[in-house]
Amino acid sequence: MFFVLSPAKNLNEKDPAPVSEFTQPDLLAESDILMQQLRELAPQQIAELMHVSDKIALLNAQRNAEWNTPFTPENAKQAVFMFNGDVYEGMDANTLNTDQIQYLQGRVRLLSGLYGLLRPLDLIQPYRLEMGTAFANLRGKNLYEFWGDIITNLLNDTLAQAGSNTLVNLASQEYFKSVNTKTLRARLITPIFKDEKNGKYKIISFYAKRARGLMVRYAAEHNITDPEMLKNFNYEGYAFNDAASNESEWVFMRSEQIK
């Protein structure tokens, strides 16, 4: 069983990682191709392409200019500690122990517009390139065309090497669209997190993102290898709802008063 997650736009570049172990991204040669093109963009072009402020555009122009290989602990940081959004706050990898970090490294993969597919301890340098960005490149009009089947093939190889046949999709639609489900050789399970608001259960983005990270933390803390055991996930008041679920979409609900 493997999990896939989206990355985060917010990055924690300052705080040192709590572990020294690191690996290198498998698709770094592809990242280098993209970065060569990104470096050609002026800050104003970045602002228009990514729909960001001038300040953020300038920051990322500087990041692109400084991006260089090889990655080392001195110029890069492990992805799971660099990403700093809602998902990663829910996961809170900084407070996991060594065995739990190894669980993440062995069973979690992070999708990325620039890096394709990452292990949690893969070193990355700061960047901003969301998968849905309409960034024309030498392979097509966007990043989905750039990555093609590269991400899916690596996922299939990863699953095969581990003898696993289940992929738990905790990524956003924007990112999971980079995976070709027709050629993915795995059973696909997509957890859905709903919160009660005014008497109705609905997906609330902030809570759903945090819950994805919480589920990965739950799996790591309980060393879960059987997907069925994920149905026992109960962090922060969530509970599996069998009636609302089906074979591929597992719904977890949380009542309003529990938060």
Swiss-Prot record:
<dbReference type="GO" id="GO:0033194">
    <property type="term" value="P:response to hydroperoxide"/>
</dbReference>
<protein>
    <recommendedName>
        <fullName>UPF0246 protein NMC0835</fullName>
    </recommendedName>
</protein>
<dbReference type="GO" id="GO:0005829">
    <property type="term" value="C:cytosol"/>
</dbReference>
<dbReference type="InterPro" id="IPR005583">
    <property type="entry name" value="YaaA"/>
</dbReference>
<dbReference type="Pfam" id="PF03883">
    <property type="entry name" value="H2O2_YaaD"/>
</dbReference>
<comment type="similarity">
    <text>Belongs to the UPF0246 family.</text>
</comment>
